[in-house]
Amino acid sequence: MKWQRLLAAGLAVMMMGLAGCGSQQQATSGSSGSGSSSVGKAIVVGLDDNFPPMGFKGEDGQITGFDIDLAKEAAKRLGREVEFKAIDWSSKEAELKSGRVDVLWNGLDITEKRKENMLFSDPYMDNRQIIFVKKGETSIKDEKSLAGKVVGTQSASTSEEYMDGNEFFKKDVKEVKKYSDFVSAFMDLENGRIDAVVGDEIVGRYYMSKHADKIDAVDVAVGPVSTFGIGFAKDNQALRDEVQKVLNDMKADGTMGKISEKWFGKNITK
């Protein structure tokens, strides 16, 4: 009977071990609820890293810009690290949905179409789409002046969305040429490969400040005025609300205004 007593004791030890493992698994799985923002985890920011002054690579190769400074300050107040990840901007919705990035924070216009695929923060800056021409060009004065012209813009931008849905650009404009980023479009404009660029005023005027002798702006809005916001995955309401709270605090205490003054010379935030 000795062997029976040993077997019973061994089984008892095994059962205790299994019970302990089950309790540990229960405790681990219960530590993160649905909709959690994973406090402590780094926030991964998806961006187009050639979109000055909102987010771009500086001369030292580091990502910098207005939105970068905002994101760093927001993460600091949340007690979290922040990681900036350059993505193909035309695939931004897929990057967000897949979880490869937590937020889209890089001069992202709030549109009804995008609201179908993501949550947005409150708007924090207005943004017009305007026309940019080569220095000395005087025949292009407004949208209708683009008839018969080759017009450049960035793929997956608000400008592209507007022109794709506008019959004038489909029928009367000679060609709408699409680029991976606005900087490439401006370079082609400088070199005479296209006649005009339709794009974000904030980005274009920043580029103009560095190339004042080559690019000019036609100070007329093309399409409706839009607003910038931060994009979040549809199922990440918790992170959206946490970030919105610190943004509200940054507005109230003047931090957002100071960051704006650093990049634009004045406070242009909403």
Task: State where each predicted segment sits.
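Extracytoplasmic small-molecule ligand-binding "clamshell" domains
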Residues: 30-107, 242, 253
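C-terminal motif of bacterial Sec signal peptides marking the signal peptidase cleavage site
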Residues: 17-20
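Short helices/loops that flank or line small-molecule/ion binding pockets
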Residues: 76-77, 85-86, 90-103, 117-119, ...
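Flexible hinge/capping segments at coil-to-helix
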Residues: 28-32, 37, 134-151
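Periplasmic-binding protein-like
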Residues: 49, 126-133, 205-248, 264-270
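Acidic, polar ligand-binding/catalytic clefts
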Residues: 72, 81-145, 216, 221-222
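A ligand-binding cleft/hinge motif common to bilobed small-molecule-binding domains
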Residues: 108-116, 164-167, 188-191, 195-224
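Extended ligand-binding regions for polar small-molecule ligands
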Residues: 22-23, 68-77, 137, 150, ...
